[in-house]
Amino acid sequence: MFSKFTSILQHAVEALAPSLPLQEDFVYHWKAITHYYIETSDDKAPVTDTNIPSHLEQMLDILVQEENERESGETGPCMEYLLHHKILETLYTLGKADCPPGMKQQVLVFYTKLLGRIRQPLLPHINVHRPVQKLIRLCGEVLATPTENEEIQFLCIVCAKLKQDPYLVNFFLENKMKSLASKGVPNVISEDTLKGQDSLSTDTGQSRQPEELSGATGMEQTELEDEPPHQMDHLSTSLDNLSVTSLPEASVVCPNQDYNLVNSLLNLTRSPDGRIAVKACEGLMLLVSLPEPAAAKCLTQSTCLCELLTDRLASLYKALPQSVDPLDIETVEAINWGLDSYSHKEDASAFPGKRALISFLSWFDYCDQLIKEAQKTAAVALAKAVHERFFIGVMEPQLMQTSEMGILTSTALLHRIVRQVTSDVLLQEMVFFILGEQREPETLAEISRHPLRHRLIEHCDHISDEISIMTLRMFEHLLQKPNEHILYNLVLRNLEERNYTEYKPLCPEDKDVVENGLIAGAVDLEEDPLFTDISPENTLPNQEWLSSSPPATPDHPKNDGKTEVHKIVNSFLCLVPDDAKSSYHVEGTGYDTYLRDAHRQFRDYCAICLRWEWPGSPKALEKCNLEAAFFEGHFLKVLFDRMGRILDQPYDVNLQVTSVLSRLSLFPHPHIHEYLLDPYVNLAPGCRSLFSVIVRVVGDLMLRIQRIQDFTPKLLLVRKRLLGLEPEGPIIDHITLLEGVIVLEEFCKELAAIAFVKYHASSTP
């Protein structure tokens, strides 16, 4: 009480006293602080009971006032005094000793405000960056301390200054010659953390510092906000207390630099206070984005950042329940790291494991965004660490297990992170994890060369329909990602040589036929016994397609040798016989909807594939190795096999199989278009295409229709029930077959629309 009265009295005296020159006033306040340590006999009293906080605040105000009164870049006498007399070094020593109690907090506040409010560059000065380095080491020593908030504020302002002038980061890379394996663990970090912070508990052994930059005081100024951006009020406490799993013991000599700023931030990411942890994550994101190569190398090789990311991912993944409903995993709201506040009591859609799932997805989003923002070499190193330590080390065993419930949950989680990833570098590693790096054509004997790829593709035809659907969904979303290797690995590498075709050199008579719009050797569908229902009345006129097409474009060029689009369109539309069609009995199920959707989706795919520089036309057959045995590849083999069983599979499975095939058909590659969408391609003996698979299904269907009484009325009733136009009633015989026929009809309409839209786009000048 007496000390507070003394402080108030001193303020009053200072206010009434005549104003001194700024430098004298500054020196007065500094000496008042030093005299306290000389004269005081009670070093147990808290610093808040002394005048020290007031004197520090006055010193700061004087420095700001001095800078405002001078020209930009000019160092005043007060700042010169602070630098020359190593005031920051002295304050660091007092803060480290925390004498009087609470002094560390006051020192952190002073450093933070000094760096934030002074506009001229201070960090290049050796008497600034050296004590700043030392103070950084004190941050995060012990978690949940009273100074945590001040520590993170200080670290964040340092990060902001480095973001403003990235070259300054070199001052914070310290030489370190000790072996990691021989070091003890400082008490700041738990046992599971990699060693390597030899200077956390002492300021001795300080590395050789770069000399003060000449002319630093004359550098061009850049305005920086007084305080770094803060969003703590609404940030969640969800970067939970899950401890990081045990890390391997280091057995090699650590690279010769230390990055204590990163180490301190890493410590604080483990804070029980979620707001502190989030701010530490923000600081790390600033640091990884710095363009300095030396900092990027040190970041990934001399700190445990890679281990922090991957081991926390592993911890959060392992904390998930053994079984989570795939629908819950798929539909849980979008997760943004740091904003995943969650209250089980307030959540009407809570389910077991939701808290753990949100925490995992939130941390995965942080890793994704961190890699997305990181300097190039740092991003690659971080992504490879996630690949090796999390994807392979944790996820792969779960995906390769034999328990159906485990397979379903792990595949649903893989599907979710495939949807969520946005970083190109992390996506690349995820693709290599799922598919492998192989680019040579597949052979049937080597389809299991990459075990995980083989297992996942096999799961597309699993005995469990749920597993099949979830795996197909995962591949469908994977195909929508902007990565060329995905489609090449799954499909294109097997179509490069076009050895699915049989090469027949054109004779003079054939050339005349081609000029009339037909392909030599192609089967005329009107003469095929499977298509006896084709007549001028039930084919779709070309004019009708044109009227339903995407927005008008300039006139198409004359026939360039392609099969005319209306023949291709009608080939798909007439595949299903009239007796098996039901869409024309129901309004709103016409092909025009497919045209609009196909146009939009094709445009999106073209935008994705533009940078891949695909050819505009198929590779010339003369240059193809047609003698090589053709294998469509494991992925298409499974899809074609499932397509061939469309009349005997559940409705939901059929929808997913046809959805993946239509996605593949949309890609603007000439070989994919030819193989999946050209009914007139001359298939080599023993080869099949999507069209030939459907033809076989239709042949089977026409035989089976004859054995089902009242087939057409039953088919129409099933369609209306699927559309919700009829209430559910008694079970209908042959329901699986009837639903399969409906999916088949809709799929053929969709393929016809895609073929038309792609032709329309390629014919536009």
Curated annotation (Swiss-Prot):
Biased composition (Polar residues): 196-208, 535-550
Region called Disordered, residue ranges: 193-236, 532-561
InterPro entries named among the record's database cross-references: FHIP (IPR019384), FHIP_C (IPR045669), FHIP_KELAA_motif (IPR045668)
A Pfam family that the UniProt record links to this protein: KELAA
Similarity section: Belongs to the FHIP family.
Function, in words: Required for proper functioning of the nervous system.
Name of the protein described by the UniProt record: FHF complex subunit HOOK interacting protein 2A
Native source species: Homo sapiens
Gene symbol of the encoding locus: FHIP2A
